[in-house]
Design a protein with these regions (language model features):
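Non-heme Fe(II)-dependent double-stranded beta-helix
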Residues: 1-25, 31-130, 135-138, 176, ...
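Non-heme Fe(II)/2-oxoglutarate
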Residues: 3-8, 52, 58, 64, ...
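Double-stranded beta-helix
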Residues: 6, 20, 154-222
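Feature marks short, surface-exposed loop/turn motifs that line or immediately flank catalytic pockets
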Residues: 38, 121, 155, 170, ...
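Short, surface-exposed loop/helix-turn segments at secondary-structure junctions
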Residues: 61-63, 132, 181, 185-197, ...
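Generic beta-strand structural signal
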Residues: 108-115, 126-128, 143-149, 159, ...
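A short beta-loop-beta micro-motif enriched in histidine and acidic residues
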Residues: 132-144, 198-199, 205, 228-229
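Short, conserved beta-strand element in jelly-roll/cupin
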Residues: 138-156, 204-205, 212, 236-239
Length: 301
């Protein structure tokens, strides 16, 4: 569906002004939307996963660990596919207000793509450099969005999500390959220098707040040097008529599950081109490993 078609449908949760702002600016921040019932469940589930990580010494398909992670002092960067590792996360995707909010932005027919739980651990949780999401998992259109849920209060000291307003309108999109054709998962220093990053907007918020950014919106988060962690639950959802061009790198079992509405009979193709990532059909590490150059070499094109 096009933005115009979506805006013609009466919203379930958002105001029309909020919807128009999302399409114009590429992001939204909604404060204190998720109630204590869901926060309590999600926090308990997250605590259980952190406890499980104590037995892990090397990053695997579930746990992406910081280099100094230990059983005594866990330090996680990410849990991949949390919806597959605790029922609370999947229940949240299906039964909370969150998917109704997303349907106000992508249309009534809504598909799940993937989820992740990013931690930004206290006293050194790593920076995430400026990047687009859609280049990791290109689709036939640009309806996909990522909606983040702050499980605890997040101030500027914890490295909240930062977005560049209207960057979803930049055409053509900037590359996430380097000059030698290797995938880096982020913009080059030269491209960053050409952007007016002084216009970046950061999205701190109290527990239960939602960050929403379009798949073309450039975003970033700073290192967390505070004494408080910043767990952020991220879910990526798409309109039913957005079809993936490539394999889902995280390979979730719920990929393409209809969260709301009905399956599309026709794909919607945006005329703008979309960068294609490397072939991840045999596996994928994480954006953290790529951007921190932990691989022997970035994935070749």
């Amino acid at each position: 569906m096009t933005p115009e078609q979506i805006l013609d449908i009466a919203p379930k949760v958002l105001t029309q002004t909020q919807r128009e702002s999302y399409f114009n600016e590429g992001y939204l921040l909604l404060e204190r939307v998720i109630d204590d019932h869901w926060l309590t469940r999600l926090r308990a589930a997250t605590d259980e996963l952190v406890e499980r990580s104590r037995a892990i010494t090397v990053s695997d398909v579930i746990f992406d660990l910081e280099p100094n992670h230990s059983a005594h002092k866990p330090r996680l960067r990410r849990v991949s596919n949390p919806v597959e590792h605790h029922a609370a996360y999947w229940d949240y995707c299906l039964h909370s207000v969150m998917p109704d909010i997303v349907s106000d932005l992508v249309g009534p027919n809504l598909k799940f793509h993937h989820s992740k739980l990013n931690f930004k651990w206290a006293n050194g949780g790593e920076e995430v450099k400026w990047h687009y999401d859609i280049s990791f998992w290109p689709h036939t259109n640009y309806s996909p969005l990522t909606i983040g849920t702050y499980l605890y209060d997040c101030g500027m000291e914890q490295g909240p999500l930062g977005v560049l307003p209207k960057s979803h309108l930049i055409d053509p999109m900037l590359s996430q390959y380097d000059a030698d054709g290797h995938w880096t998962g982020c913009l080059s220093a030269a491209d960053c220098a050409r952007l007016d990053l002084a216009k970046a907007v950061f999205l701190p918020g109290p527990a239960g707040s939602l960050t929403i950014h379009n798949c073309r919106t450039l975003h970033y988060s700073a290192r967390n040097d505070s004494d408080l962690g910043r767990p952020l639950l991220l879910n990526t959802l798409t309109s039913a008529d957005a079809m993936p061009y490539t394999v889902n790198p995280i390979k979730p079992k719920h990929d393409q599950f209809m969260v709301r509405g009905e399956r599309a009979r026709f794909a919607h193709h945006d005329p703008r081109p979309c960068l294609i990532p490397p072939d991840w059909s045999k596996g994928y590490s994480s954006i953290f490993a790529l951007q921190q150059e932990e691989e022997v070499q970035a994935v070749a094109r």
